[in-house]
Amino acid sequence: MLLLKISVYAVVIFFVGLFVFGFLSNDPSRNPNRRDLE
């Protein structure tokens, strides 16, 4: 069960890091007319 818990935490951290990296690399200041954030 410990290995399963570590695997789940690794996947969650991976997806959170991927989301944060994608959000930071996609700078909203370059796209002031974005309407998908409303």
From Swiss-Prot:
Question: What is the role of the protein in this entry?
Answer: One of the components of the core complex of photosystem II (PSII), required for its stability and/or assembly. PSII is a light-driven water:plastoquinone oxidoreductase that uses light energy to abstract electrons from H(2)O, generating O(2) and a proton gradient subsequently used for ATP formation. It consists of a core antenna complex that captures photons, and an electron transfer chain that converts photonic excitation into a charge separation.
Give a Gene Ontology cellular component term annotated to this protein: plasma membrane-derived thylakoid membrane
- The source's superkingdom equals Bacteria
Q: Name one GO biological process term.
A: photosynthesis
Q: Where in the cell is it found?
A: Cellular thylakoid membrane
| Family under the similarity heading | Belongs to the PsbI family.
- Whether DNA-binding counts among this entry's keywords is no
Keyword vocabulary terms for this entry = Membrane, Photosynthesis, Photosystem II, Reaction center, Thylakoid, Transmembrane, Transmembrane helix
- Quaternary data: PSII is composed of 1 copy each of membrane proteins PsbA, PsbB, PsbC, PsbD, PsbE, PsbF, PsbH, PsbI, PsbJ, PsbK, PsbL, PsbM, PsbT, PsbX, PsbY, PsbZ, Psb30/Ycf12, peripheral proteins PsbO, CyanoQ (PsbQ), PsbU, PsbV and a large number of cofactors. It forms dimeric complexes.
- Residue intervals passing through the bilayer: 1-21
Give the record's membrane topology. Answer: Single-pass membrane protein
Lineage, please? Answer: Bacteria, Bacillati, Cyanobacteriota, Cyanophyceae, Synechococcales
By its UniProt entry, which Pfam families does this protein fall under? PsbI
Q: Which organism is it from?
A: Synechococcus sp. (strain JA-2-3B'a(2-13)) (Cyanobacteria bacterium Yellowstone B-Prime)
Q: What is this protein called?
A: Photosystem II reaction center protein I
Which NCBIfam families does the record associate with it? Answer: PRK02655.1
Task: List the InterPro entries.
Answer: PSII_PsbI, PSII_PsbI_sf
